[in-house]
Every structure is written in structure tokens, then in C-alpha cells.
Amino acid sequence: PYLPVNSSLPQPSSSLEQCANDLAQQGYCLLHHALTNSQLEALRKRLTEQALAEKQKGFAFQDGGHSQNWGDFRDSAGELRPQEFTEAQGGRNQRVWMLVNKGAVFLDLLSHTIMRGLVTGLLGDHYLLSSHTANIANPGGVAMRLHTDQWWMPPPTRIGRAGLPAGSMSRELFDNDTESTGAISPPVAVNILWMLDEFTESNGGTRLVLGSHLSGRQPDSTAKSIAATGPAGTAMLCDGRIWHG
């Protein structure tokens, strides 16, 4: 419902201008040939080694099971519960965290010239890296619920209105002023997804609601989404406000 009628889906492009336009209008863009064949081979090899080692050592993080809601990492007392995110608890996908500590090939991604240019164009001159993680998607995983990666950002509101305090917001509880001010929050977060394998409709690629980054709202679970697709070596950059899962 947010995508203009005459718009078309972003396609993998080597043009910085086209990627910037897609990002602004649709909420995401696809950079073609972002990774060379040698980079792809090195990244796959190192990631496979690391993922296997973490499974063998017994601390692999695995999610995507029917009772494993993304974001429910703590119990009612606020304690982490890693025992709930294991293969034994139904986890299908494997997350490999903290890639900054797990190989130079992962560090090299952080200095990719074109992607850094796109990030700077969206966020400005100064920003922080908050996560560098791999997700190995396997058959049988449950689809992630639609969410934004900027859910913690309070939206603009009216003077005198008592909204939900920022510290009480969560992925499931957020402040939506039913009387729209016409203003939306700026982007303050972005994600880059490096496709080490082809992303298709059928293999669990990220789903997005096009243009939803301009809605000024948190997700409507009934919104129509599309699968982001692209060949191996493509990089996808997403505005932190876009609805995705």
C-alpha cells in the first residue's frame, strides 16, 4: 500500500546513483557484484568453518523454531536464556555473532567503498557499527514477524500529548499517535546484507514491504511483502525504518 503505482522493484545495479534512488524511494537497494568470486569463496569457507566449530563446542545459536520468537532473548527476570536458542529446542537457522572477532575477511566488508558511501549518504558523517553477524538459513525455519530495526526511535508527536515513554518501547509495543502529525522520524539505522548465496523467493530470503519506511508507522502484520532476491555476490542495503521479516 505504500509503493507508488508506477514504481518497479529495485534490481541489482552497479550505479551508485540508482542505488541511492532506490534506497530513498523504496527503502532498500541492491548493489550488483558487490563481492568478487574470490571474496565469496573466502567468506563461505571461513563462515562454514566458524559455524561448524561453534556447533562442535556446544554454543551455536540456532533460531527459527516455532517457539523461538526473535527478540525474546531474556526471561521475565531479564536474564539471558541461550538454552532456548539451540537445535534441541527446534532451532533451524544458525547465527554466527561478532564477526569482527572471527576473521579478516569479515572485517574487509566494513570498508567497502560503495556501501560506505551509501551509508554515509543516509546517516551522515558519523555512525557506529552495532552488529556484524551471519545468518545461515536452513529448510524448515519459521518466517520472522514483520518489524523495523528502528522500533526504539520515538516518532514525532504533538505538544502536550502523553505518549509511550521511550524506555517502555519494545519490538511488540510502540507508540503510534492515531492523529498523524504528518512528520516521520529520519533514518538513524541501516542494515547491509551480503548475499553469499543466491536469494530467492523459496530459500528464505528477507521479505520487505516496499515504501513502508515512509509510512511513519510500525508494521501492519497484514501488509503485503515481497522477497528481496539477487544473485550471490549482491549486497542489499535497507533503511532501518522499512518493514521486513
Residue ranges of model-derived segments:
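Non-heme Fe(II)-dependent double-stranded beta-helix
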Residues: P1-Q25, H32-M169
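Catalytic palm active-site di-aspartate
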Residues: G27-Y28, G233
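A structural signal for short, well-ordered beta-strand segments and their strand-loop junctions
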Residues: L30-H32, L128-S131, R207-L208, L237-C238
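Short, well-ordered beta-to-alpha junction loops that form the rim of enzyme active sites
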Residues: A34, S131-A134, M195, G211, ...
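Flexible loop/turn segments at secondary-structure boundaries
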Residues: Q39, T200, G216, H244-G245
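Active-site rim elements
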Residues: G103-D108, E179-S180, A223-K224, G245
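Catalytic core of non-heme Fe(II) oxygenases with the double-stranded beta-helix
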Residues: G117-L118, G141-T229
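Conserved metal-binding segment of the jelly-roll/cupin
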Residues: G230-H244
